[in-house]
A protein has these predicted regions:
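Extended active-site neighborhood of metal-dependent phosphoesterases/phosphodiesterases
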Residues: 87, 105-194, 198, 213-223, ...
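Active-site glycine-centered loops adjacent to acidic/histidine catalytic or metal-binding residues
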Residues: 72, 98-99, 125-126, 203, ...
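Residue-level marker for buried hydrophobic side chains located in beta-strands
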Residues: 67-69, 94-96, 122-123, 200, ...
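A short C-terminal boundary segment appended to hydrolase-like catalytic domains
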Residues: 33-34, 42-44, 49, 289-360
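Bacterial N-terminal signal peptides that target proteins for export
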Residues: 2-12
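Hydrophobic core
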Residues: 13-21
Length: 360
């Protein structure tokens, strides 16, 4: 856990250099506060528009949009293919869940994602701390001061979804400012009648099959109970350069060991509401692949051979997730990125009007 003033300052500096070059972003995005997405998105892009009347009784049930999620990007030819794959699905929000350029400069990555940079939301990865240019003083004068000391954890609403970004590289313990912000924010989202879904983005995986990086038990023990308490639906992560989707999970601290969560629904693809949190690792944006040694019992689907991204289709009561790989590979039932499906799942919530579950 990182809690020193020096490290917090470093985290802010690194995140600021990435976000500052995204010219269509408002500095408000960087503050640890809930963003007024209605105004923010209208400021930044004609492609990302949220109108207050979408929350009205007349229009709320018609909400339908999609988001794209990927982590561990780099500046490779495969990164370019992933960007094209994402662009082909025309998402309204793109979540880059950490580890962006892997270079001293963000320029190469910014160039690759330029077709949808106005739609981008970012969570912090370890390479945003390790790889930057200019030194602390240069970044301070150029980026930090004009942005008035922004923080790197935040939340925002888009239509009927509440998004929360956690920064695992600044203090996130129970007594930290970040934890207090996250808890208050989730509590408010849960009590908001306009919100059907809560998605969290956080780079370090809390659960994983055996692969390059083990699961982080510290952040898991702090935040999974909080996610259970406030009904978080999905957690997006990266760090491991492969794709993994868990079953819906409940926190289980069995004799001080939380590595064996409770599988609350063992269906492979279709889930009902409030059965548990689904943890998704999508470190597949293009940097490299990490081999998965075996499949953990709490993992429903995994893949370590393909680059691509996770697409989430959302209406008022249904989430449909689809992992699209970038291209055909010999021996696999996959085609090109126009309709290449590696994994799919659906979460359906009760329709109070007719007591039935809806599906896309």
């Amino acid at each position: 856990m990182i809690s020193t003033k020096k490290t917090i300052l470093s985290s802010i500096l690194c995140f600021s250099i990435i976000l500052s070059v995204l010219s269509n972003f408002s500095p408000k995005l960087l503050y640890a506060e809930q963003i007024d997405t209605d105004s923010l998105i209208m400021e930044n892009s004609n492609n990302l528009q949220t109108k207050n009347n979408q929350y009205s009784n007349n229009n709320y049930n018609d909400v339908k949009f999609n988001i794209a999620v990927a982590a561990d990007w780099g500046c490779t030819e495969d990164t370019k293919k992933t960007a094209a794959n994402i662009q082909s699905k025309n998402p309204e929000i793109v979540i880059a869940a950490g580890d962006l350029s892997y270079e001293e400069s963000a320029d190469c990555w910014i160039d690759i994602i330029s077709p949808f940079k106005s739609k981008l939301m970012i969570s912090m990865g370890d390479h945003e701390y390790q790889d930057t240019e200019g030194g602390a003083s240069g970044i301070m004068n150029t980026y930090l001061n004009p942005l008035e000391l922004p923080k790197t954890y935040y939340s925002f609403d888009f239509n009927n979804v509440h998004f929360v970004a956690i920064d695992p590289y600044v203090d996130y313990g129970h007594n930290s400012d970040q934890y207090q912000f996250i808890e208050d924010d989730l509590k408010n989202a849960t009590s908001d009648s306009r919100i059907d879904w809560i998605f969290v983005m956080e780079h370090i995986p809390m659960y994983t099959s055996p692969t390059e990086h083990p699961a982080d038990s510290t952040i898991r023990d702090i935040y999974h109970p909080l996610f259970d308490k406030y009904g978080v639906d999905i957690v997006f992560s990266g760090d491991n350069h492969n794709y993994q989707r868990t079953f819906p999970l409940k926190y289980n601290n069995d004799n001080g060991n939380s590595s064996n969560p409770i599988i609350s629904d063992n269906n492979q693809n279709d889930y009902k509401e409030n059965t548990g949190v689904i943890y998704l690792t999508s470190g597949t944006a293009g940097k490299s692949h990490y081999e998965i040694e075996e499949q953990a019992p709490f993992v429903a689907k995994q893949d370590d051979k393909h680059f691509g991204f996770l697409n989430i289709d959302i209406n008022d009561k249904t989430v449909k997730g689809t992992f699209y790989a970038n291209e055909r590979e010999l021996g696999y039932y996959y085609v090109d990125y126009k309709n290449n499906i590696i994994d799919h799942f659906t979460i359906s919530k009760m329709n109070a009007a007719n007591n039935e579950f809806e599906k896309l």
